Amino acid sequence: MKENAEQKSGHVTTRRLLDMKQNGEKIAVLTGYDYTIARILDRAGIDVILVGDSASNVFSGHTTTLPITVDEMIYHARAVVKGVQSATSRAMVVVDMPFMSYQLSEEEALRNAGRIMKEHECDAVKMEGGSSIAATVRRITDAGIPVMGHLGLMPQSIYKYGSYKVRAQEGAEAEELMKDARLLEESGAFAVVVEKIPSALAGEIARSLTIPVIGIGAGVECDGQVLVINDMLGLNREFHPRFVRQYADLNTIIEDAVGRYLEDVRSGDFPSPEESY
């Protein structure tokens, strides 16, 4: 997005997020995967829209985030950016780098990050990992691409850990996570997501870093919160983890609307003369 457009619209930037942390303003993040929802989120005033690799789950029906590709992420990101640009152009758009798009080499990671940025004008990319990706984060940020980190429960490593349980509950893992958070900051990350870790640890990390710490299942002491929009809107009645607050029950609302539509079509009540030409 062009600088003059950012200035006119109050577009959220990495600098703005840092100011929010310093001023004690909480940062609100939601995932988004399409044009229509992105327009709604931007108009509602959301700070950051994360084009998450969770699209692999909620859009494609996979059981993990691993199958989604760079091309598919670009497809979703392009739609989200267009949605934001057609609304108020305020929200920052951050795009997940999918599994194996940055693990092979620094060069491959930079190429994919550059492609994601160039092909749809997003604001930043997000990567999972600590010390193992620190050099890659540095390489990408040195090229002018902002990077958001992700620690704690890392869905792309689900087969390594074997479960979605809370991470860093014991001293050694908690200490390692703290070191990784500091290392990501030193490597140039502008923010870091911490997922499903003890709230006390998340608060300690937030206080020890100068960059924003965004929590998901990590307690209220983080600098901001992120949720998958499908979860907080109640679109999947079978999935309701402890850390999700459900703000609507769209599953029931949509089922009811479809049921009434079916009834009206089959009875001949729809379309009415007023709805016909």
From Swiss-Prot:
Catalyzes the reversible reaction in which hydroxymethyl group from 5,10-methylenetetrahydrofolate is transferred onto alpha-ketoisovalerate to form ketopantoate. Its cofactor is Mg(2+). The keyword Amino-acid biosynthesis does not apply. Keywords: Cytoplasm, Magnesium, Metal-binding, Pantothenate biosynthesis, Transferase. Binds 1 Mg(2+) ion per subunit. Homodecamer; pentamer of dimers. One of its GO terms (biological process) is pantothenate biosynthetic process. Mg(2+) binds at residues 53, 96, 128. It catalyses: 3-methyl-2-oxobutanoate + (6R)-5,10-methylene-5,6,7,8-tetrahydrofolate + H2O = 2-dehydropantoate + (6S)-5,6,7,8-tetrahydrofolate. This is 3-methyl-2-oxobutanoate hydroxymethyltransferase. One of its GO terms (molecular function) is 3-methyl-2-oxobutanoate hydroxymethyltransferase activity. It comes from Chlorobium phaeovibrioides (strain DSM 265 / 1930) (Prosthecochloris vibrioformis (strain DSM 265)).
